[in-house]
Swiss-Prot record:
GO terms for molecular function: 23S rRNA (guanine(2445)-N(2))-methyltransferase activity; RNA binding; rRNA (guanine-N7-)-methyltransferase activity. This is Ribosomal RNA large subunit methyltransferase K/L. Disulfide bonds: none annotated. It catalyses: guanosine(2445) in 23S rRNA + S-adenosyl-L-methionine = N(2)-methylguanosine(2445) in 23S rRNA + S-adenosyl-L-homocysteine + H(+); guanosine(2069) in 23S rRNA + S-adenosyl-L-methionine = N(2)-methylguanosine(2069) in 23S rRNA + S-adenosyl-L-homocysteine + H(+). It is found in: Cytoplasm. It comes from Yersinia pseudotuberculosis serotype IB (strain PB1/+). It holds the Pfam family RlmL_1st. SUPFAM superfamilies: S-adenosyl-L-methionine-dependent methyltransferases.
């Protein structure tokens, strides 16, 4: 009787135990990551050949205490290695774990290798060769605290490597995990199965192998036991011959049929090739189709199971498309697959909620480092495809109301970019902005007290509802998360797409970029201020400080300004400003662009201007100041410098975004200036709920100064 250990992915131990017991294993004991069991040689080889769930089958050789590297060396050398494999065989060591003395797995593996080689040298005066690729013998050592376990890895390569999958698409499932997903799905051999997002076909192939009674190890070309001195070749040949007979008979007798599709034709060809190598190609029909064209391949029956591992996305920009995909998929399941079972495996439970289906079973498992969930559903017939209650219904109703009001208003105003929703409801803390045909949803980062998964679920509900209310294709929605920006973060790229969209604002054309930066290049709340600047600038010299993408300069130029001077420290934004000026025909020497720290430039120039627009940051570091710039603390210093540049009858428009900003009117007067707040005049209909989004002032020379 052999003592053996079968390893598996975390979360699959109970399934593996049942499988081993069905094969005839005794004394099965579950531990994290695997199952200890007992069995004779026949059972040992059967587990290697037939286990669909095990990652490896290990034969323990020794277990001992390790308090030093010498203990490790001596414990390994105590094993009679020449009796286990011949000196003409190659070997490799896999070492995992550390303790206070063995702090590096590579060092541990080196000590084990030395002990094995020295054992051969001492007894035979010869040494075996170490091979990293396909060694004849694989030694597995696991160190936990002060206990080391040494085992012979009978698998060789991991058992998930069945031998049929030479080619895969992106993010493939391991074969043993795919087998577990199928077993947990409720699918029964003899019934049909559909995978509408099948990739390279792993789920379908594994199910077809189960249905046709094909041993998962039948196609493997390399094992870890064939160079083992105790290898029973006759018994192994008997078991593999028996497995081949069962596979041929099973292929003829099974009534199961399998259907797979994927949008990628190249991946579908891989899936077909994999199925041929696995010997189950005649059971599976593959098609290259977009999921939107999914139909039930057996509309008249029998009913079966839809099993899939849909894409889940790791990048924020992909989420709207994935949310729309899952929402559409849920509707398809109800319309075309009534009476069937559905089982989906995903790293994103939030995306599964977008199906708007109620799961009746749920399992957890690991897919490599990812925590995943598998949910099973019973699909009820619904030929009309009613979608059920709209998620985030309160949000959807508010958005619908705002859209009806604001779309009409924006058309009358002659603007394409405006805010549709601005955290109107506390449970849905997002801003929704329309930019021509596209929409940007910005999530305000939730407080740390809010459960991240709950916040993510709520955001997904918002996106789902936004797409539905606006009847918007998912590729027209851009998702961003807005957090407080520090230092230069606001200038750093979020993406590298370089996609610009030309939009209209009154008589101006402006370039926006919805993906690459946190902001889009157009501050919507300053729209009326820009319009006012255009009217104020006719025949005037206009200065734009902290100019960003120069949109105020565009309006001033179109308003007939004699000259515009646009100053910003960012080369990126100045190049953007130049594009904005050029598309409006504002070219020539009278339209200057200056890259400089605005505060330093301000203190070093003596030019004169009629209209000055300044929208400084609330807080920043400045080379000119030894400490920092704070708009509340330092606005008088700023005004003193601006006064120098302002012609006698000139006007400064001063704006900032600091909530609760208090203008020092007495200090302004002492400088010989007058300030008048015009915040209410610069706030538009789409920002009516957020009166504190900015404050705005007109500053002129006092009557005495004039």
């Amino acid at each position: 009787m052999n003592s053996l250990f079968a390893s598996t992915a975390r979360g699959l131990e109970e399934l593996l135990k049942s499988e081993l017991e069905a094969l005839g294993a005794h004394d099965c004991k579950i531990v994290q990551g695997g199952v200890h069991f007992q069995g004779d040689d026949r059972l040992m080889y059967q587990s290697l050949l037939w286990s669909r769930l095990a990652s490896r089958i290990l034969l323990p050789l020794n277990e001992f205490k390790v308090y030093s590297d010498l203990d490790l060396y001596l414990g390994v050398q105590a094993i009679d290695w020449p009796s286990i494999f011949g000196v003409d065989k190659t070997f490799a060591v896999h070492f995992s774990g550390v303790n206070d003395e063995i702090r590096n797995s590579q060092y541990g593996a080196l000590k084990v290798k030395d002990a094995i080689v020295d054992s051969f040298t001492r007894k035979m005066d010869q040494r075996p060769t170490v091979a990293k690729q396909q060694p004849d013998i694989r030694v597995n050592v696991f160190l936990q605290r002060d206990m080391a376990s040494v085992a012979l890895d009978l698998s060789g390569e991991g058992l998930h490597q069945r031998g049929y999958r030479d080619l895969t698409g992106q993010a493939p499932l391991k074969e043993n995990l795919a087998a577990a997903i199928i077993q947990r799905s409720g699918w029964q051999p003899g019934t049909p199965m559909v995978d509408p997002m099948c990739g390279s076909g792993t789920l379908l192939i594994e199910a077809a192998m189960m249905a046709s009674d094909r041993a998962p190890g039948l196609h493997r070309g390399h094992w870890g036991f064939t160079a083992w001195s105790a290898f029973n070749e006759a018994l192994w040949r008997e078991l593999t011959t028996e497995a081949q007979v069962r596979a041929r008979r099973g292929l003829l007798e099974t009534s199961s049929r399998f259907f797979g599709s994927d949008i990628d034709r190249r991946v579908i060809e891989m899936a077909r090739a994999n199925a041929r190598r696995a010997g189950v190609a005649e059971l599976i029909t593959f098609n290259a189709n977009d999921i939107s064209k999914l139909v039930n391949p057996l509309p008249e029956g029998p009913v079966g199971t839809v099993i899939s591992n849909p894409p889940y996305g790791e990048r924020l920009e992909s989420e709207p498309a994935l949310i729309a995909l899952h929402n559409m998929f849920g509707r398809m399941m109800k319309t075309a697959f009534g009476g069937w079972r559905l089982s989906l495996f995903s790293a994103s439970p939030e995306l599964l909620s977008c199906l708007q289906l109620r799961a009746d079973r749920e399992f957890k498992a690991k897919n490599g480092p990812l925590d995943c969930v598998q949910k099973n559903y019973q699909l009820t017939a619904n030929p009309q495809g009613a979608g059920g209650a709209l998620v985030a219904e309160d949000y959807a109703n508010r958005l619908r109301k705002n859209v009806k009001k604001l779309d009409k208003w924006a058309k009358q105003q002659g603007i394409e970019c405006y805010r549709l929703y601005d955290a109107d409801l506390p449970d849905y803390n997002v801003a929704v902005d329309r930019y021509g045909s596209k929409v940007v949803v910005q999530e305000y980062a939730p407080p740390k007290t809010i459960d991240p998964q709950k916040a993510r679920q709520r955001l997904f509900d918002v996106i789902n509802a936004t797409l539905a209310v606006l009847e918007l294709p998912s590729n027209q929605l851009v998702l961003k998360t807005r957090e407080r920006q520090k230092g230069k973060n606001q200038y750093e790229k979020l993406a590298q797409k370089g996609e610009f969209l030309l939009v209209s604002e009154y008589n101006a054309k402006l370039w926006v970029n919805l993906t690459d930066y946190l902001d889009t290049g157009l501050f919507l709340d300053h729209r009326i201020a820009r319009q006012m600047l255009g009217k104020m600038s006719q025949g005037k010299d206009f200065l734009n400080l902290f100019a960003y993408t120069g949109t105020a300069s565009v309006h001033a130029g179109l308003g007939g300004a004699r000259s515009t001077t646009t100053v910003d420290m960012s080369r990126t934004y100045l190049e953007w400003a130049e594009k904005n000026l050029r598309v409006n025909g504002l070219t020539g020497q009278q339209h200057r662009l200056i890259q400089a720290d605005c505060l330093s430039w301000l203190s070093n120039t003596d030019e004169q201007f009629d209209v000055i627009f300044i929208d400084p940051p609330t807080f920043s570091n400045s080379k000119r100041m030894e400490t920092t710039f704070d708009v509340q603390r330092d606005h008088l210093v700023l005004m003193k410098e601006l006064k120098r540049l302002l012609r006698r009858k000139g006007t400064i428009m001063f704006s900032n975004n600091k909530r609760g900003f208090q203008m020092d009117l007495a200090g302004i007067a002492a400088l010989g200036l007058e300030a008048k707040e015009i915040t209410a005049l610069t706030q538009s209909e789409d920002f009516a709920r957020n009166r504190q989004i900015h404050n705005c002032w007109l500053v002129t020379h006092s009557q005495e100064e004039k």
